[in-house]
Amino acid sequence: MRILKLPLAGLLFCVMALFAGCKTSNEPKAPVALTWEMGASDIEPGYYENTFILKNISQKPLKKNWTIYYSQLPRGVKQEGASEVKVEVVNGNFFKMYPTDEFAPLAPGDSMRITFLCTYKLDRNSHVPEGTYWVETVDGKEGSPLPVALKALPLPSPESMSGYPDATKIYESNLRLAGAPALVQSDILPSVKKAVAIEGDNVVLEGKVALAFPENFAGEAKLLKEKLTGLYGLEVVGNASVKIVLEELLDRKEAVNDEYYTINIGDNLIKISAATPHGIFNGTQTLLSMLKDKQTPYLLEAVSIRDYPDLAYRGQMIDIARNFTAPENLKKLVDIFASYKLNVLHFHFCDDEAWRLEIPGLEELTAVGSRRGHTTDESQCLYPCYDGGYDPDAKTVGNGYYSREEFIDLLKYAAERHVRIVPEIESPGHARAAIVSMKARYNKYFETDPGKATEYMLSEPEDTSRYVSVQYYTDNVMNVALPSTYRFMEKVIQELNAMYQEAGLSLYTVHLGGDEVPRGVWMGSPKCQELMKEKGMTKAHDLSEYFITQMADVMQKNGLKFSGWQEVALGHTEEAHQQLRGQAAGVYCWNTVPGSDEVVYQTANNGYPVILCNVGNFYMDMAYNGHPDERGLDWGGYVDESVSFSMLPFSIYRSLRVDMAGNPIDLNNAEKGKTALTEIGKKHIMGVQGQLFAETIRSFDGVEYLLFPKILGLAERGWNAHPAWENLSDIREEQAFNQALALYYEKISKSEMPYWAKNGINFRLPQPGLLVKDGNLYANVAIDGAEVRYTTCLLYTSPSPRDSTSS
């Protein structure tokens, strides 16, 4: 069995999750309490039944002058027939319930059931209603919001739900990891390309170490010194028996790319060589990684390492719009990302639910767009959502933004660690926060300065278009026919450019979003109809193409290339493709759900630079598995550290080993009939990126939990894009994959998890596998050394007797 004893820090989130809903407060409470329960999951095709039980906990009868608001992941509501209480969607993921004319006063202590249907499904606890609060109206005036106690009853029969982790299957899967080799010094993540033992005495680091470097590597030396001292207690001095030397690579032709480095260890000398500061930084991270699983005195065996990445772009997107991640926490992530040689932070700072970056001259974006709270007109803040609370001034995950100074500081911090930040302005869809903020600006100025009021408007008052986005918004798309829309976009781009310049950096690209524009948009807009007539357009996609080509020109005018989600490169005329190919920095291809997965290679073959963002491998917000207590989404499958590891950049159809139902995929035939990656296409695979959308995240602990350990597969595959099993088939492919996977888990077990626990990084431990055989219960776990306890106390060491009635 694989047994590991870890410090408690690594288990903290599991405990915290049990008590996440237990909040205590002395603030006034509403006169009611709610209990929510799940009903039939398929009461009608595409609908499930659920019920709120409303209880009057006050001393007075409950009248008709109230509304209860709540948040929940987006879904439609269906309520047929007469009802005493109406439930409806306000917008997106914000809902309300209120008494109808049929409502009879509810006596103190009495309860009533409010049953209704919702679309989709509900099979995990992070998707239930939350953030309930009460507003009472007296004499036509609203009172202050009051929190409503909400108890969500356990989901019925979770073990029968699709994707529920079967303990026996986990046990069988864990058997693949048997026989993992003992780790050697150079077994780090991401794996080095080549490590060879050499002649020379081993190096022992203890107490003091000398560090020598030329001036052009001073920044890398400073960071190395901080880590050696802070993590390993080594005092860096001018002269010591052991010396670390950072030096320029003598033969620059040896460098495969700008990130290439070498390390030579032996005879009291550690020499890191590279042609660039980035290469030196990579070498220092490898040195630090080799120390992770060691105890003082730190023994380093004589070795020569040659290493470089296969893919130039290795990024992680963090969504701070849905739920806010503070600057100090994002810096923590940048530091961790850099340690695994990830070199891009995709800064998703705006979406429908918030705008999180100060833009001088557009103060409403943060004065309104960064705050969520109770409102009926959104003149001062956005609607609550994702349990951000009803107080727009409270310090919650719903509120907050980065000041200009904080963002510049983040840019500098990341650049020191060779992490480039790519900002994203979601457009034209997913833009509700910006649209509402610019409406607030209009209302602020329309009487005193009409020109200023309309200068940056993103919507048209006369637009009668009817649409519903994937997230159930009806007003989240910019009007692409308004000159003010492009004025707004250019203003934000120019302010971003100025921030980068002040940080001493060059802004290369801005990600423009471009995804999930819903059907029906723009068709009721007089301005759009005028533009379509003028340009000879016949369909909504023509307007999308117009927007992205216009924005590509705006970017080019400002010395930049554009980036965007895969939609920015799809369905265009050849004339538009010719323009966009030359102006694109990156097309982020995300939809690899079966039936849509050919888009990735089609886009690369068409000459666009592609960043692989495969939902099935790299969407970190996908739940680890189907257990109802696992936070996350599951529309693209389940993603754990083995799934991210299995991704093949140059063979994406074989990147998943099971389908979305958990059934094995025939890897030998997975590519048949699919678009092949051409030689031109191969040159346009720029890199890989993980995505962490934040709809189900409620804290920074939750951010870390969903990232670690699954981000390690992303780091490994970006650095080593051609693993040993890539071109194999049948049993040889399976054996090669399992051997590599076993070594990968051994690295996680022995080096990474103990390091995370020691340094306050929250992470997930996988659940054990169980097998009942011959009257005994067998257990195993993927993490080498993890403790397995039977019931609540006994440490599992051997099979336990079990009869058919045991629980």
For the regions a language model picked out, list residue spans one by one.
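Active-site neighborhood of glycoside hydrolase catalytic domains
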Residues: 476-580
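Asparagine-centered strand-capping/turn motif at beta-strand->loop junctions
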Residues: 54-58
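Flexible, acidic glycine-rich loops studded with aromatic residues
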Residues: 561-569, 574-770
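Short acidic, flexible loop segments centered on an aromatic residue
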Residues: 64-89
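Acidic, contiguous N-terminal accessory segments
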Residues: 23-27, 128-309, 564-570
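Single conserved hydrophobic/aromatic residue that forms the stacking wall/gate
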Residues: 796-806
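Low-complexity, acidic Ser/Thr/Pro/Gly-rich terminal tails and inter-domain linkers that flank the onset
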Residues: 27-44
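Feature activates predominantly on carbohydrate-active enzymes
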Residues: 256-476, 482-501, 505-509, 689, ...
